[in-house]
């Protein structure tokens, strides 16, 4: 029986998403105008925010850009907010969009150097605990200067490379042969060519490293202005530069970093939560042979490319630390320098670098549309008022926990943007002092970054890993990710909240003021546009 037009419409709508999900989104689009016009704009606004969080939580069913975008377009169409308010939000956060467009693309052209470094780590260091710590620390360091998504993308590339090499050799082929590493490794008679126990151990080993690296990106990403997109939004609202941001965060981020490293050591040593998988000797030999094979084939031209990438890496770190230009422009300079000196001049080769970041950049623009609704309908007013009624440390802890809980189910860029906007409005209205605003900005930044490792919904890097082609190969499911992240979630969240609740954050911030490491800012500075930052 031929398909009817209505069946064709439902079939095409949101592609391969489950039918119940499609019906849910269509229901949202029908309910929202009714609530807005006949019940209350405030209620309709909150329902929209919850629907948007639902689309983020269901990111594995359908990329949130389409369902979230439809909700945002409708919100503007029915008058929940205006197109000019959405544009204003995007203008205020232009640096973040530039960071995603140019910085992620720039690092794409430095992948060879990063691949080289991570490959050496696995082949040269035999101790599993030491390799885990190195991956965690290397990811943390890189994420402090690069986008976490990019760091995870590189490590995924390393892991896929290793998996395919082992699969190829174990299937009886040499390094240069073509091979489908996604196959189950059976011969023509349907018998297993691969040692099942060896393969399972190797999968476990790769899972461990990827989870340590993923948490490492959160540990490093929270420390600096460019580590995560929401950090840049918070820094712009507070008018902080690179050095000041890192200093202000350090009373929370430094204890958390040490706690994270200790957790990495303990879960590996005690083999808890699925950690402690060893790299089988036979697999290690294959990987070492491959590394030697690659080193032997590396020409002077290839070596020069690595040297250029290393120099550009030094420029990147220096440019960010000294704030020589806006983050996005430094990213653009990285693209120009690496491609010019490494001879990448083909338009299609350049285009590949932008594929990773642009869908997320478009999604971020949709975030800002929902933020515009929150501002116009004053949705967070009552919640913020309740939090601001508490004094001092209690207020900071409430903001940390509120951000943390929401970041576990929703994207932390969205959560951070909403809360910093509300706190800034309270500052402008004279409800809090400028010094308290600065402390709240630290609580919001750490609250959105640290507890969000709990699920792939909160951390874009985790979601990227879960939706990658590698996840099914190494049997990394949503549930397994949440379970393996659990020890980190508990430790990072508790250490973060203790650093704030104990008064350590306030005491250290006062010490930084007294030693002139940072200065007191005025309310007038916060009113200055982000562009002046």
Curated annotation (Swiss-Prot):
Transmembrane segments: 10-30, 67-87, 96-116, 131-165, 209-229, 247-267, 310-330, 355-375, 396-416, 454-474, 481-501
Gene Ontology CC entries for this record: plasma membrane
The entry's keywords: Antiport, Cell inner membrane, Cell membrane, Ion transport, Membrane, Sodium, Sodium transport, Transmembrane, Transmembrane helix, Transport
Topology versus the membrane: Multi-pass membrane protein
InterPro entries for this protein: Na+/H+_antiporter_NhaB
GO molecular function, one term: sodium:proton antiporter activity
Catalytic activity from the UniProt record: 2 Na(+)(in) + 3 H(+)(out) = 2 Na(+)(out) + 3 H(+)(in)
Location in the cell: Cell inner membrane
UniProt-listed PANTHER family: NA(+)_H(+) ANTIPORTER NHAB (PTHR43302:SF1), TRANSPORTER ARSB-RELATED (PTHR43302)
UniProt-listed NCBIfam families: NhaB, PRK09547.1
Family the entry assigns: Belongs to the NhaB Na(+)/H(+) (TC 2.A.34) antiporter family.
Function field: Na(+)/H(+) antiporter that extrudes sodium in exchange for external protons.
Protein name: Na(+)/H(+) antiporter NhaB
The organism of origin for this protein: Shewanella sp. (strain MR-4)
Gene name tied to this protein: nhaB
